[in-house]
Amino acid sequence: MNNYFFFFLFFLNLYSQKESPFENLNFIKIVSDNNNEIYKQELDKLRTDEASEIDIIKKEILVATKFRDLKKVILLINRQIEIEGESPDLLYQLGGTNGILAFQKKKFFSIIYLNEMLKSFSKGLVLNPNHIPTLAAYIDALYSVPKILGGDKKKAIKLAERLSEISKIDGHLSMAMIHFKNENNQMSNFYLNMFFEELSSLSICEKENPKICFSNKSNNFLIKVSQITSFFGKEIDSGLCALNFYIESSNFKKNLYSLEWIYYLKSKLTFLNGNREESMKLIKLSLDLNPDFELSKTFLRINF
């Protein structure tokens, strides 16, 4: 699975560094325009390869993702769909990429991307009603997007209930998110506790378990696990193993999150796990990348 979908909370300030268990779009790294020439050179190299069109498209998607040219990513995914046909995975990627662009744009300009996001997720679920990443993404989108723009809170709740029947851990997480955003702390905590119990039972830190546990989930699920465990200080080992698996996987080259945030999460989890020395090294790495990253500055000031 690819990691193109991220949570959609459309009233966040893009540049804020607010910490929340269910918000992470504001930690997407935006690459400077200074890299445009390097980007062009990398694309030009691909076009000289003797490969099929579909292989070149897949490589171009990786390069465009690396340089955050998300409009290009959308064009390439649409071309891939023209060649290979629609699939839940491709529609999930397409919906997620449109969602990121919707978040980055001003509200008026985000409407077209919101529509494309919702349409892609809906079509993906027609092809496979049990596609877990799409279900989780669609639930979040439907609950977060204003009704006038296509959101539907009642539908989101029904889908979350269905998701719980397919995957308990994903369903519990979606229900916790819904109640958290609705400021119903009692129900949010109820589903979070169920999520943590399910996470504990998966024993993802055992040697072969991560591949088994995450085989039908998006890479973003790993980030969700590490983010939520670090925020609530529960199931720390599982959160750390999930984050390490994310960083060490071959799909990390598709990572869109800022490395300073990734190092912050790992530093916090490592600290909570009792390793202050390693945590200090990681938080310094975060601040070396971005000396103004407030979460890391605050964490360093309070804990060291």
Regions found by a protein language model. Give the residues of each.
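Residue-level recognition of tetratricopeptide repeat
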Residues: 28, 53, 62, 87, 96, 103, 131, 168-170, ...
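Canonical positions in the second alpha-helix
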Residues: 45-46, 80, 124, 162-163, ...
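Short coil/linker segments at helix-helix boundaries
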Residues: 68-75, 86, 92-123, 127-130, ...
